[in-house]
Amino acid sequence: MSAPLRVAVVMTAVYAAGGIGMVYLPLWLGQCGLTAAAISQIYGLSSLLRLGATPAWGEVADRLGRVRPVLILAAAATAALSLGYLPAWGFLAVLAVLTLQSFCSAALQPLCDTLLLGLAHDGRLDYGRVRAVGSAAFLVTAVAGGPVVAAFGSASAPVLMAMIYAAAAGLGPLLPDARPRARPPSTLGSFRLLTNPTFRITVLMSALIQSSNGAYYSLSSLHWRAAGLGETTIGLLWAEGVVAETVMFLFAGPLGARLGPGWLAGLGGV
């Protein structure tokens, strides 16, 4: 199995778990004694944590000099913590579980992207097309998860998440054991990036795009259920947006070459 295919397989599992968690986990949290306001607050706090957790995991991988064991550890911990939602009840208990799980899961997509971008840099794959595989996996579980959750109840959502994250950890040894191309930068050197105006603009654009999605990520499933829609329909509504994302990734390479990264990012924001 080629290195790009091995990374794509693991990435598929990571994004598939996200399809269950993002679409159906809020439905379970709504049965754990939480209001919609409390759920949005918990997701907001976990998002703040991820701001520090993501670069921290990257720093660990840099210092260790290997990406694969860090990704496997994070996937296994995320799988175990997913089961913690089942006994959790009330704001503080759910906050504790979601905080710990968010810290661990913050490593997964960025480290998969690190491996993909390294292979793309070597000319061994088209990043956008392979990344579209992840979006497709999200789409499949978002749609297929609806009948499962409808049949077994929303408590099945964290169980499905745990199973898929465990599969990602089990597939982890297939990953190429990538090592840094150069000496890891110092922490001070990382902060010097903030003096780069292009980097600051990129971070600002990313922050605006991601924050605009916050309410949609945390509350859309609850809103649609309150409107009387079933789990299968909710999954299909999520899938509609992911189809657009997948098409965007498929054509990101040619569009980026024609428009440039700035216009491409702006198109993504639209």
Question: At which residue positions do the language-model features occur?
Answer:
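Cytoplasmic helix-loop-helix junction between adjacent transmembrane helices
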Residues: 97-133
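Juxtamembrane intracellular "pre-TM" segments in multi-pass secondary transporters
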Residues: 1-2, 172-208
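Symmetry-related core transmembrane helices of the 12-TM Major Facilitator Superfamily/SLC fold
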Residues: 156-173
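Helix-to-loop junctions at the C-terminal end of transmembrane segments
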Residues: 52-66, 149-150, 247-261
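Helix-loop junctions at membrane interfaces in 12-TM secondary transporters
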Residues: 2-4, 85-98
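Structural signature of the two symmetry-related core transmembrane helices
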Residues: 69-83, 162, 263-270
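Residue-level signature of mid-helix packing/kink "hotspots" within the transmembrane helices
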Residues: 47-55, 138-139, 143, 242-250
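Helix-loop boundary and gating motifs at the non-cytosolic
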Residues: 1-47, 199-237
